[in-house]
Amino acid sequence: MSAANVPLEATWQGHVASTLDAVVLFEACLSGNLRHVPRRPHDRERQDLIQSGQIFIYEEHASGIKRWTDGVTWSPSRILGNYLIYRELERPFPPGEKKRAAKKNKKQTNGGISKSEGCLRQNTGMNGTATGANAANLSSAGSMDPSEASRNPERALIGSLVDSYPFKEGGLVKKTISVQFRSVPHHLVSYYTVQDVMSGALATPTSHSGFLRNIVPRPELILNQNFRAPIDEVDVDDNRLIQHPLSSAHQEYVNHMHPPTFRTWSVPHVNMAVANPRQWPTSMVPAQQQQMPPPQHAQYLQTHPGAMAAPMPPPNYAQPSTHHPYAYQDGVMRPQVTTSSTLAPDVYRNMLVDQPLSRRHSTAYDLSNSSHAIGLTQTMSNNPVDPIRNMSHPFMQATPVYGNSGRLQEPVQHSDAFPSPRTLPQQEPGLDGSQQHSASLKLEGEESHLQHNNSWGTYDVAATHDVFLGGTNTDQSQPFLNPEGEEEQYDENNPPPTWPPGSNNSMGRL
């Protein structure tokens, strides 16, 4: 038998008073406790199916229903919370006439509810006086405040559809709502009359004593919807909302998605003076620091001993150490440079050098028998040369080991590690009578010094290579050539720079 020949039945019978009632019915259909309707009612079925208390839920894709039709003449829709409501009209509108609301207010409508009476009931306080603010809210043609509707059950059933159109006396009210689950729209259509709901003939899903009482909607039906009003809207009875399992299920879902976290340590207030926390009074220590619950992962670490957890270190409130970048020495302020010798003077002396180390050093010269040791003379600080920095030290003479030792060549033996010293030509005095640029290189004992005289003073610089500072020697000079090889022309007042023989003056290098 095809679906068109199967008798159509309503999904449930009752009344949906709140968004929570509709969500419970949607969940019952998704879980298989209730069934979706596969099609719209036929013309012959409308008289029996479109009755007060009938609720139909259909899936848009599976049923192919784009628009629900029931053959009843309805008024324009109005918003009531998350629902759209319609009221049955006494007669349909003439063809081509717009569905305009009546301008003048009638004392009694065909539906049995007067707008003036409804406003009076809505805005009447405990002392019988009316408030103008509430009356202004109720006069809007759109949605009505759910809190106001909870105090007036009649207004909660029809919203603002009071006397705007020629409503049918004792006619039906249609209430619709839609949700999306996994990108599939699901629609609910409910029919009721004001008299049946007011008399208590129609029950709600949340107050049902049967299987619907234990239906808990899934979080997607609540959190992933574009509802105008929140799910805990005020038009739901507080007792029903608290007793329904949704309240506890929603709280468990929130706790699961956003678990509470604990701070392992806390810092003092921004206005509090930073000092040692041990010196703080008990009243000034934050409460979270005085009493802290155990971490949540403690039980996991006990169960899994192999798991590692790096605790967060407490803040360091100690005063930072003061560093002096300059120090007085020999009556002159000199910058204090931190080296490895100043940090740990005994590190290198305590190292074991019995066995050869796999370090790569130059073996071009054998300095074991040479009196000239390579090292930097610390003339600035007047400190003795560290023995470990001497190339004749056994630590520096360790044999390098890289793979096969047979491939290494024997070091070249030289009688003298450096050529004989030479004296640089003396420069002529400058215009002011001082030696502007004069330098001489000489070797004295085991140290090689470069004595440099200028207008500011004389100082010694340790030298291990030939150094030449340009001057104005006219005896051994060469003309300055530009990169093209041409001789530069200078006037008599501005003589050209000269270079010693053998130097590459075209590149301007020493």
UniProtKB/Swiss-Prot annotation:
Pfam families noted in UniProt: Gti1_Pac2 (PF09729)
InterPro entries for this protein: Gti1/Pac2
Coarse class of the protein's main subcellular location: nucleus
Stretch list, region Disordered: 94-152, 393-438, 469-510
Domain of life: Eukaryota
Gene: sge1
Skewed-composition ranges (Low complexity): 123-143
Taxonomic source organism: Verticillium dahliae (strain VdLs.17 / ATCC MYA-4575 / FGSC 10137) (Verticillium wilt)
A cellular component term, taken from the record's GO annotations: nucleus
Polar residues compositional bias, start-end: 471-480, 501-510
Function: Global transcriptional regulator of pathogenicity. Differentially regulates expression of effector genes. Also required for radial growth and production of asexual conidiospores, and plays a role in mycelium pigmentation. Not required for induction of Ave1, the effector that activates resistance mediated by the Ve1 immune receptor in tomato.
Record carries keyword Transcription regulation: yes
Keywords: Nucleus, Transcription, Transcription regulation, Virulence
Name of this chain's protein: Global transcription regulator sge1
Membership in a protein family: Belongs to the MIT1/WOR1 family.
GO molecular function terms noted in the UniProt entry: DNA binding
Subcellular location: Nucleus
